[in-house]
Amino acid sequence: MSNFVLHPDLERDGVLIGNFQLSRVLLINDSNYPWFVLIPEIPDTSDTIDLSKIEHERLWEESRIFGLAIMKLFNGDKLNVASLGNMTPQLHVHHIVRYQNDPAWPAPIWGKHPMTPYSELQLKRIRELFTSAELDNFTAAICNG
């Protein structure tokens, strides 16, 4: 996986939370929602059908593990999981914890409200959640500060 390069959109909007065996996990820097993306670190993939059978199974197992964890950590009402890629062609799977009182409920979040970046303290706390969480085959990003 040495040829993997993160798409500039994901680099710009994401904050590294950690890594699974296959996927990099980013927090989208929008404090309106607990919004994460899993990005399989495989070059030149834009859709799940580009993955091998084993990679495909691994991605959805990582998605299941991560989804369970974030619903518990953020006490959500609903978990939205989607792989769109219309604007950012690199394969990435959104995991968005939704609340009945969130700014866009019940509609999709895209384009509803301007992104509101997390404060450094908020980012630190979210990283600490994942440092202490025990997710199978997950390595949390180093939490500085």
What are these regions (language model features)?
Residues 1-91, 95-145:
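HIT superfamily nucleotide-processing domains
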